[in-house]
Amino acid sequence: MNIVHKLLFTLIITSIQVNAQNINVNNIEIIRDNFGVPHIYTKTDKELGYGLAWVHSEDDFKTIQEAYLAGNSLLSKHIGLRGAPIDFLSQLIRSDEIIDSLYSTIDKRFLEVVDGYAQGINRYAELNSSEVLVPKLFPITVKKMLKYSFLQLFVSSEGDRAVRAIFENDFESLTFQRRNELGSNLFSFSTNR
C-alpha cells in the first residue's frame, strides 16, 4: 500500500508541476513606450495574464496586495485595527462559500487568464520578497483573486453602506430603497407599432 501512495503522490506532484510550467516566460515580451505604458506581446492569453500581472506589480505592488488582503480578510494583518471592519465585511458576505459554490460555472478560458495573472504576481513576489506586505497572502490563487472581486462588487453595489446602516441602527440612511422611485430603466412594448 505504501508504494501506491508514493506513486499517487508522485503523479500529483508531476501534474502540478506540468500545470504550473505551462507559462513560458520566454514567450512574453513587455515593451514600455516613452510614457511608460506597457505593451505586452505573448502567444497565449494565459501568458498575457502573467505579463499583465508582472507590469502591474512593477507599477504598484503594494496596492495590488492591499486589495487582495482586503478580499481575503487579511487587511488587518497589514494595517492593524483599521483593517478589521473590511476583514469583517469580507467574512460577512461569505466570499469563500459563494466562490466555492459558483466556481465551476466560470468560463475555463477566463480562469486560465486569471491563473496566469496569479502566477505572474506570485513570481514577482518571489523575486521581490522584501516588498511582500503579508506573507500569508501568498501564493495568490485564482480563488483568492475572485474573493477580492466579490468584495469589490459588493462595495460598488453599496452593500457596505447597507451593512453600516444596519449596525448603526440607521435605516433612514438606506436611501437606495427610495432613490429610484420613478424608475431608471423603463421598457414599453406595444403591438400597435
List each model region and its residues.
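Bacterial Sec-dependent N-terminal signal peptides
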Residues: 1-22
